[in-house]
């Protein structure tokens, strides 16, 4: 009995220690995004990707690829940063014995880290991180507690205007936002086109909030028989370049939507003014938009929605944690914005007049859903 009791006490002590360690880690959890952002700014991921001669590089070798680096301690500092990234599986790390008790860490790209390398189109996840780490967004979090107690949107409390209006006042931030949206769209749309086959057999497709038309450019490049209508605010589409098979139409989605065999709405558009997507808006706004889409579709038409799905019950799974964090970003930045559960999407679709919702495939933690008329 005594032995069993001792084992139970030891197990409880180990559990308590693990819980305390996890709590301590959470205290410094803000370190990761700042270190990752700085590493991207230093082009570390691209340096590792370009060096074909070696599978892994030391911090000193990585620094040698930075022509503007003048700090003699740069390699030591960088090694400590890369150690953190390796502990989160953003990099692979090997320890090499140099002799006399001296070791050297060497780093290479991991499967996760490759998403921060610029692809053949120059796109990566890096610019989206730059947006989330920008002071304009970061400062909103300092108002979260008071927003809970007193009301209001944290972003508005800091800047005095809605997030949709702010870029007009800050050209530098506007560029950061636009770059984030362009890169995010390119990365996600490529994977959508690889996995989703619902564009086949469409004759006409309307992209609501399509910005400069890049979504339709990518879609019609793969499906050249589709006639695309890129729909956004007039001042947005007037700057859109010409693409084969794509017409640019200006208007307000809350008033009406152009007709087509299908309507496309993807999470994150090309500029803040163009973020006409469901997670940016309240249920009332979304319902109004979806009713307009319903009117614009033929009897066999569909709305193709690309959005995250937030489960009703919290979970420690990475997919759920990621969506829950995005939900808080919406709450902190956008009036009425939020991530929704599958049940909430079905309820909105039903109230707007749609007969059903099909969840087709999951891409980059976003679900491609079809709302059928």
Swiss-Prot record:
InterPro entries: COMT-like, O_MeTrfase_dom, Plant_O-MeTrfase_dimerisation, SAM-dependent_MTases_sf, WH-like_DNA-bd_sf, WH_DNA-bd_sf. It catalyses: catechol + S-adenosyl-L-methionine = guaiacol + S-adenosyl-L-homocysteine + H(+). It comes from the Eukaryota. S-adenosyl-L-homocysteine binds at residues 209, 232, 252-253, 265-266. It holds the Pfam family Dimerisation. Gene3D superfamilies: Vaccinia Virus protein VP39 (3.40.50.150), Winged helix-like DNA-binding domain superfamily/Winged helix DNA-binding domain (1.10.10.10). Disulfide bonds: none annotated. PANTHER family: O-METHYLTRANSFERASE. O-methyltransferase that catalyzes the conversion of catechol to guaiacol. Involved in the production of guaiacol in fruits. This is Cathecol O-methyltransferase 1. The lineage of its organism: Eukaryota, Viridiplantae, Streptophyta, Embryophyta, Tracheophyta.
């Amino acid at each position: 009995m005594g032995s069993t009791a001792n084992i139970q006490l030891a197990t409880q002590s180990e559990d308590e220690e693990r819980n305390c360690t996890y709590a301590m880690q959470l205290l410094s959890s803000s370190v990761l995004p700042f270190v990752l952002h700085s590493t991207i700014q230093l082009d570390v991921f691209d340096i590792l990707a370009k060096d074909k001669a070696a599978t892994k590089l030391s911090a000193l070798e990585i620094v040698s690829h930075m022509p503007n680096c003048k700090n003699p301690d740069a390699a030591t500092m960088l090694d400590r940063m890369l150690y953190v990234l390796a502990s989160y599986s953003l990099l692979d790390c090997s320890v090499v014995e140099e002799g006399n008790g001296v070791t050297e860490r060497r780093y290479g790209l991991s499967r996760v880290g490759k998403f921060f390398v610029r692809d053949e189109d120059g796109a990566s996840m890096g610019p989206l991180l730059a947006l989330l780490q920008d002071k304009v967004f970061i400062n909103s979090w300092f108002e979260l507690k008071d927003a809970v107690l007193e009301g209001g949107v944290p972003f508005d409390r800091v800047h005095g205007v809605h997030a949709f209006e702010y870029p007009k006042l800050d050209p530098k931030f506007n560029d950061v936002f636009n770059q984030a949206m362009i890169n995010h769209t390119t990365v996600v749309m490529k994977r959508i086109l690889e996995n989703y086959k619902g564009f086949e057999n469409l004759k006409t497709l309307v992209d609501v909030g399509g910005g400069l038309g890049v979504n339709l450019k990518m879609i019609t490049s793969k499906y050249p028989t589709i006639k695309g209508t890129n729909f956004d605010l007039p001042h947005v589409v007037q700057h859109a370049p010409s693409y084969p098979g794509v017409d640019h139409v200006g208007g307000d989605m809350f008033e009406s939507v152009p007709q087509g065999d299908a309507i496309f709405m993807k999470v994150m558009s090309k500029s803040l003014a163009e973020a006409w997507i469901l997670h940016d808006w309240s249920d009332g706004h979304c319902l109004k938009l979806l009713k307009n889409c319903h009117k614009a579709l033929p009897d066999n038409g569909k709305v193709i929605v690309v959005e995250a799905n937030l489960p009703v019950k919290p979970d420690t799974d990475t997919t759920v944690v990621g969506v829950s964090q995005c939900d808080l970003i919406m709450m902190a930045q956008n009036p009425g914005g939020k991530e929704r559960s599958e049940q909430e999407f079905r309820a909105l679709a039903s109230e707007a007049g749609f007969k059903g919702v099909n969840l087709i495939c999951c891409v980059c933690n976003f679900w491609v859903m079809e709302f059928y008329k």
